[in-house]
């Protein structure tokens, strides 16, 4: 069935017509016109058939551009009797369709107005009719004479938009048989029609005149073709337009460009998906894109979506897709283009479980400092971690045991063989995670070589054997038995004297005893040893008020026996006199009476405190918060700034170290007082240990020296596993130095930023728990940190977090405003409660992996936000309960903030129930808003929990509240996170919203004058 497409007046550009086509990405392309027949500009005879003869005349005239062209004219209206009809036919030659499914025809013609021809009686028309006829072959000579009688399909009746009057200069051809070759330029109409679908080899087009005076100046037959195009990394060929018209589509299958592959189902799955498709409509326009292609691994998009270009040298792309190549990870390089993965540099490897974007890593270096303790026929083998871990965290140890016929060096193996099966290892021989192993089943007096290998996830990929350290060992069953018991003889603030009996089985002459001791607050691996030729020893240079663990073993010519059981003794607090066992009875009685008096006084104090609590209604007084302790004794620390001579404070509060015991190594940083270096400290009779050494700048002011030594004296007073330990000071020689334990991993904030996303919520909570425990300990001494933040906490190789920077003065440091409580900002009021606020900011830093609090907001913007009670939102992946704990620490009223012991208890509860630490959302998403704004509900207008639920947009849980009898605000205020699943509230977003509003409800109920419904 033919369809119409009318064009405006005027000429058209021959050959190609600009046409916009709309795809998903909206490109512009050119629709192609494939010409089947065109008489435009013809000057020689065309020779189409006419019926009857003379019904149409072929003449040369001037067109609208005053160019000479061949035309067909029909004008037989003058002189005809009224009512006589005209039936003049004009037929083209046979036109090959050449694959076209639909033909378009563009006609340029001129029609004379009947009114200007002086013809009446209804015999004049200003229209003509267009027909077409399909055929597989041109008409035979026998059928040419009857061509007008064949079965034609009407396309349309063509009417002129404008008919033109017959001018005097052109009237000679317009009526009757008069002809001339000199015409005035014709005024033309332009009409376009289409017909189809075409199914045979070709077709004819015919024009029927039934009484018009017209000139057919140009006839153009053509078909539309969608051009070849590149789109979405696929090429699509030229495609013939549909034969059913503009609304129908022809699908074209695309071919992926070089180094591209089809997306699966058009959305980007694995290779081998369906080829992409475009659809060509009836007007030669591409539309409706389905699917596409994507660049293969090792290739990236180029020139928009036209090409897939090889990744340049030094970059890679592991997965198919239309994303750019990435630079090679650390310690890898791609020497050639189009790399799907970057090969590791020599000596570095990537484990099979490592993703392509992971940096290459190497095997660890050998373990360090092997030593052992003989325990009868067994021994406990110890070692220190390797110096280099290879950039990985999956360090393991293997133990190789060799039995030798004589004492051999570890490097020699000529007379050694693998240990017998009787030798066993506890907990195991391979894959050890701890730096010790118990080796049992050893034969007496047989020399062994124990080799400890350090391995990690890439050790098997290295052609070299694992790095190892070895030690010669031997055991004897004739060594002394264990010392059965140990007694405390006396104690002082800095020393303890102990004694012990002989072993029950000496198995020879006792040569001496080895005493091992360590501070219970520290790791047992930091123990010290001393040798005594008698069964009594005095251990000096201890810390006042600390508990120490002791063990002793005897040595004969056969070797050391096993250590006896551990016993614990405590030094006296600073300032108390020494105590001995044979004390006088009067002293004992006096001590007992004094203790009873003290307990009575303490009981009176407690009763007074309880009475004041009931009267005031606050959780505690500021004085009690700062100065009371669970043991009912007052703890305190000495402020070094009260000393006129800082060296005197150092002598009393810190331990002087002989410089000859110190070995200084490389620089690891710089502080406000001088360079910080790694070093080794090995006092006489003690094991060597790694330390950090800060030396005071030469030529510094005396005030700088006083501050430097004052901080060391302050640090030396606190002994806690989560507080940086002072190892000693050097003040009697130059340069002045302060030695602390070495924290290998540096400040907590930078440590987390370098390892974003590598820890579980449980691990992060454990880090925060350690800091909270340290702050609980400091608060028991009424010590206020004033500068607590993630950068003031250091991390060691065992991921233990320790508080540092004690004595730091925050005055004049605007950078600490982000951690400061409101009362600090407005009144300079530093208390343990302000430390709690700072600790909440530290919690947020930990959960956000070192993100800067309040991001890029200015200090003034931060102050304004805090004053308006805006608070930091939960970091990505932060458990709800943990963020609620942060919000508790950020209470504007400091009396409502939790104590550090409450925070420690909360962390312990989370660690015991790790299922409460499930993250709310994706760890990769950033919060949608900068700060949380507390919802300002009009509580007096809310008369029930149901109304409250509607006000916060959770009315869907009204039935749940009614079912469980939650009829008052007091009931609702007692709900916790653990209660919500039992109420049927399981959506994490709803839980968070409900808990946040419960917190606001609790604040409202605590306000004076609030009425509970």
Swiss-Prot record:
Kinase-defective receptor for members of the ephrin-B family. Binds to ephrin-B1 and ephrin-B2. Modulates cell adhesion and migration by exerting both positive and negative effects upon stimulation with ephrin-B2. Inhibits JNK activation, T-cell receptor-induced IL-2 secretion and CD25 expression upon stimulation with ephrin-B2. Ligand-binding increases phosphorylation on tyrosine residues. Phosphorylation on tyrosine residues is mediated by transphosphorylation by the catalytically active EPHB1 in a ligand-independent manner. Tyrosine phosphorylation of the receptor may act as a switch on the functional transition from cell adhesion/attraction to de-adhesion/repulsion. One of its GO terms (cellular component) is cell surface. Residues 33-231 form the Eph LBD domain. Residues 363-478, 479-574 form the Fibronectin type-III domain. Residues 612-1013 are cytoplasmic. It is found in: Membrane. It holds the Pfam family PK_Tyr_Ser-Thr. The gene is Ephb6. Residues 940-1004 form the SAM domain. Keywords: ATP-binding, Glycoprotein, Membrane, Nucleotide-binding, Receptor, Repeat, Signal, Transmembrane, Transmembrane helix. One of its GO terms (biological process) is axon guidance. ATP binds at residues 668-676. Residues 662-911 form the Protein kinase domain. Residues 32-590 are extracellular. Interacts with CBL and EPHB1. Interacts with FYN; this interaction takes place in a ligand-independent manner. This is Ephrin type-B receptor 6. Belongs to the protein kinase superfamily. Tyr protein kinase family. Ephrin receptor subfamily. The protein kinase domain is predicted to be catalytically inactive. Its extracellular domain is capable of promoting cell adhesion and migration in response to low concentrations of ephrin-B2, but its cytoplasmic domain is essential for cell repulsion and inhibition of migration induced by high concentrations of ephrin-B2. Its main location: membrane.
């Amino acid at each position: 069935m033919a369809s119409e497409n009318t064009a405006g007046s005027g000429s058209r550009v021959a050959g190609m017509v600009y046409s916009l086509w709309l795809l998903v990405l909206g490109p512009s392309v050119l629709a192609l016109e494939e010409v089947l027949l065109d008489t435009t500009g013809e000057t020689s005879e065309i020779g189409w058939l006419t019926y009857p003869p003379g019904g149409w005349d072929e003449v040369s005239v001037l067109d609208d551009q005053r160019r000479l062209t061949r035309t067909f004219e029909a004008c037989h209206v003058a002189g005809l009797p009224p009512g006589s009809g005209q039936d003049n036919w004009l037929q083209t030659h046979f036109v090959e369709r050449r694959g076209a499914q639909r033909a378009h025809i563009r006609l340029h013609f001129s029609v004379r107005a009947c009114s200007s021809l002086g013809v009446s009686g209804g015999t004049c028309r200003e229209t003509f009719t267009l027909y077409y006829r399909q055929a597989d072959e041109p008409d035979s000579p026998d059928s040419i004479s009857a061509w007008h009688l064949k079965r034609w399909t009407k396309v349309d009746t063509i009417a002129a938009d404008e008919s033109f009057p017959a001018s005097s200069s052109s009237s000679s051809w317009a009526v009757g048989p008069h002809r001339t070759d000199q015409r005035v330029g014709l005024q033309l109409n332009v009409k376009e029609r289409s017909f189809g679908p075409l199914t045979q080899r070709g077709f004819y087009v015919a024009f029927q005149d039934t009484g018009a005076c017209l000139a057919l100046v140009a006839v153009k037959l053509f078909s539309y073709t969608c051009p070849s195009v590149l789109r979405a990394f696929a090429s699509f060929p030229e495609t013939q337009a549909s034969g059913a018209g503009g609304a129908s589509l022809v699908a074209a299958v695309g071919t992926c460009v070089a180094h591209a592959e089809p997306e699966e189902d058009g959305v980007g799955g694995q290779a081998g998906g369906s080829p992409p498709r475009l659809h060509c409509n009836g007007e030669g326009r591409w539309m409706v894109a389905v699917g596409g292609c994507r660049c293969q691994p090792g290739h990236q998009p180029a020139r928009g979506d036209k090409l897939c270009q090889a990744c340049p040298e030094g970059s890679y792309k592991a997965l198919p897709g239309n994303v750019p190549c990435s630079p090679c990870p650390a310690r890898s390089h791609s020497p050639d283009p189009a790399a799907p993965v970057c090969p590791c540099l020599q000596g570095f490897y990537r484990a099979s479980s490592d993703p392509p974007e992971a940096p290459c890593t190497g095997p660890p270096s050998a373990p360090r400092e092997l030593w052992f303790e003989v325990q009868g026929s067994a021994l406990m083998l110890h070692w220190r971690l390797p110096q280099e871990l290879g950039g990985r965290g999956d360090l393991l140890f293997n133990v190789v045991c060799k039995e030798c016929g004589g004492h051999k060096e570890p490097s020699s193996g000529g007379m050694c063989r693998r240990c017998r099966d009787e030798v066993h290892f506890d907990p195991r021989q391979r894959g050890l995670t701890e730096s010790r192993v118990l080796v049992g089943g050893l034969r007496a007096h047989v020399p062994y070589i124990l080799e400890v290998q350090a391995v990690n996830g890439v050790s098997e990929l290295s052609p070299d054997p694992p790095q190892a350290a070895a030690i010669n060992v031997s055991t004897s069953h004739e060594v002394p038995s264990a010392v059965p018991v140990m007694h405390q003889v006396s104690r002082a603030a800095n020393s303890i004297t102990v004694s012990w009996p002989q072993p029950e089985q000496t198995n020879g002459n006792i040569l001496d005893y080895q005493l091992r001791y360590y501070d219970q607050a520290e790791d047992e691996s930091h123990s010290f040893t001393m040798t005594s030729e008698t069964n009594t020893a005095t251990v000096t240079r201890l810390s006042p008020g600390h508990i120490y663990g002791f063990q002793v073993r005897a040595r004969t010519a056969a070797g050391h026996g096993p250590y006896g059981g551990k016993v614990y003794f405590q030094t006296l607090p600073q300032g108390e006199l020494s105590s001995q066992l044979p004390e006088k009875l009067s002293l004992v009685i006096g001590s007992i009476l004094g203790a009873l008096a003290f307990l009575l006084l303490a009981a009176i104090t407690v009763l007074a405190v309880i009475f004041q609590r009931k009267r005031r209604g606050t959780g505690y007084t500021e004085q009690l918060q700062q100065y009371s302790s669970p043991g009912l004794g007052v703890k305190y620390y000495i402020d070094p700034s009260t000393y006129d001579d800082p060296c005197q404070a150092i002598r009393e509060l810190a331990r002087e170290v002989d410089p000859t015991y110190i070995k200084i190594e490389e620089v690891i940083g710089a502080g406000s007082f001088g360079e910080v270096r790694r070093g080794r400290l090995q006092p006489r009779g003690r094991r060597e240990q790694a330390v950090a050494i800060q030396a005071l700048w030469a030529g510094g002011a005396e005030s700088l020296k006083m501050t430097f030594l004052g901080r060391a004296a302050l640090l030396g007073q606190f002994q806690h596993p989560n507080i940086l330990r002072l190892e000693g000071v050097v003040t009697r020689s130059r340069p002045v130095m302060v030695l602390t334990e070495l924290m290998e991993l540096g400040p907590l904030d930078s440590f987390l930023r370098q390892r974003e996303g590598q820890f579980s919520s449980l691990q992060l909570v454990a880090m925060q728990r350690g800091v909270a425990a340290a702050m609980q300990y400091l608060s028991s001494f009424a010590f206020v940190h004033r500068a607590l933040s993630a950068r003031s906490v250091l991390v060691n190789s065992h991921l233990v977090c320790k508080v540092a920077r004690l004595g730091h003065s925050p005055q004049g440091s605007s950078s600490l405003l982000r951690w400061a409580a409101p009362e600090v900002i407005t009144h300079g009021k530093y208390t343990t409660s302000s430390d709690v606020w700072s600790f909440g900011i530290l919690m947020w830093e930990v959960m956000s992996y070192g993100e800067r609090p309040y991001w890029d907001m200015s200090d003034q913007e931060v102050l304004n936000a805090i004053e308006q009670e805006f608070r930091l939102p939960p970091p990505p992946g932060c458990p709800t309960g943990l963020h609620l704990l942060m919000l508790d620490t950020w209470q504007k009223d400091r009396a409502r903030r939790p104590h550090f012991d409450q925070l420690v208890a909360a962390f312990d509860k989370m660690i015991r129930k790790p299922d409460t630490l499930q993250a709310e959302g994706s760890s990769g998403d950033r919060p949608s808003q900068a700060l949380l704004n507390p919802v300002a509900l009009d509580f007096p207008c809310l008369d029930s929990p149901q109304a409250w639920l509607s006000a916060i947009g959770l009315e869907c849980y009204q039935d749940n509240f009614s079912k469980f009898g939650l009829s008052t605000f007091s009931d609702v205020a007692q709900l916790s996170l653990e209660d919500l699943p039992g109420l049927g509230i399981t959506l994490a977003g709803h839980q968070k919203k409900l808990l946040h509003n419960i917190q606001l409800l609790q604040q409202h109920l605590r306000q004076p004058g609030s009425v509970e419904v």
